[in-house]
Amino acid sequence: VIIPAHAVELADGVFSLGAARDVEGSLVEGLMFIDYKKGNAKPPWAGGGGGTTTTTCFAFLANGAKWKNLETWIVNPANVEGLSDAFVFSNIAADIQKWEDASSTNILGNGNINTSVLVADESSPDGVNEVYFGNVDSAGAIAVTIVWGIFSGPPSQRKLVEWDQVYDQTDYNWSSSGEANKMDFEN
């Protein structure tokens, strides 16, 4: 995944991909979120926690923008680290379930394993919510999430229509058990 030349940086690690038509013909906007590696963390009792009290997280993409229908998703769990298909799938499904439990809403539908080559949609959505391991061509990027939706206009008309997520297996090693010097896919 490469930050497209047409992308406009809105904030650190947040890029507008512009407008495009979704598979139903609606005009939607794309956003790319890059999750950069941060320094090693130290718990407060060990002398850490001295950072700022502000956050750079986003609470909402846009007031009213949410999934209007259950969204199925697919994952191609193939990876160079040897993480099993079952582990990758069940971990993503469990993370989605935590998100749904926290919101008390069934947001995403069922997931499926897919062995086809998946492509993050940087120019326009293809109607498929995709997760896979690949190359994220941005220094220090652990993963990229691309979200397509309607983020402006009357809040009741706003919605999310697609998301794609890519974990960088070119620059980072991944682990299922929290091994030192590897990214913990469990978290």
Place the predicted regions along the sequence by residue.
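Disordered inhibitory propeptide/activation segment of secreted metzincin zinc metalloprotease zymogens
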Residues: 1-85, 141-160
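Metzincin-family zinc-dependent endopeptidase catalytic domain
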Residues: 88-187
